[in-house]
Amino acid sequence: MMREGIVFASYGTLVDEARRTDIAPVAEALADAFAGLPFAEAYTSAWVREHLAKRGIASTSLGETLASLADEGVTRAIAQPGLIVCGDAWDKLAAEAQALAERFPDGLLLGRPLLADEQDQEEMAEALAEAFPGRTSHSFARVGHGTKGVADAAYAGVVEALHAAGRTDFALGLMEGTPDADEVAKKLVRNGTHSATIVPLMLTAGSHVRRQLAGEGAASWTSRLNAAGIATDCTLAGLGSLPGVSAIFVRHAREAEAIR
C-alpha cells in the first residue's frame, strides 16, 4: 500500500528570528497543503546543522530526513527545495535526493526552485509589488545571492516583470556577481533616487546576509549606497515571509516530478 510523505529542504539559518519568520511560514504552508501526510524539514547546510547542534537544536540533512521517512514506511516522497534558482546548490540537492531514490518504491519526486520559469518570476513580482508599495523618489534594491552561470537570469526576470508592470522603482543587485552594490548605487543616482530600501531576494536573511547587506562596516551594501548619497535602510525579512512565496512553493510541490 502506497504511503506518501513530504520534506521541505532549506539551507537553514542560525538566526532564530529568521527561522520563525522566513522558513516556518513556508513549512507550515506545505504541511497544510499536504495535510495528513508525514511532513519533515531538512537543512542542506552542514555548517548550519553543526552550529545548531552546539546550541542543542537538532536538525537533519535532506538525505537523513528522506532515509527517516523511508524507515517509517513512506513509499512515495516529495522533496521540495527552499532554493531560489537552479544553481550549484540545486545540483547538489538533486544528487543527494537521487542517492535515496531506491528507498521509495512508489517514487521520489523533486519540486522546482522558487524562480524556475517565467510564471514564477511574474508571481514573485506580484508578491513584491504588493509587499512594497511605491514611494516618491524612493527605490527598492532587491539583492539576490548570485550563482555561477545562467541561473542569475531568473533574478533579472523578476525585476523585468516588475518594470513591465510599471514598478520601475525596483533595481536588481547580487551579493556574488553583477550588478554589485557600487553599480546599483550608480544606477539609482542616475535615476534620481533620493532614498532606497535594500531587500534580500533570498528565502532567509541569515547572519552573513545581515552583515553584507545591513552591517555597519564600510563594505556593506547599506554603507555603500549611503556613501553614494542615497539615504538607505535595509529590511531583514526574507522572501519566506511573503504569502505569495509560500504559494509558489506549494504549487511546485504539487507539480513535482519523479527522479529518474
What does each of the following model-derived ranges do?
Residues 1-260:
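Extended amphipathic ligand-handling, pore-lining, and cofactor/metal-binding catalytic surfaces
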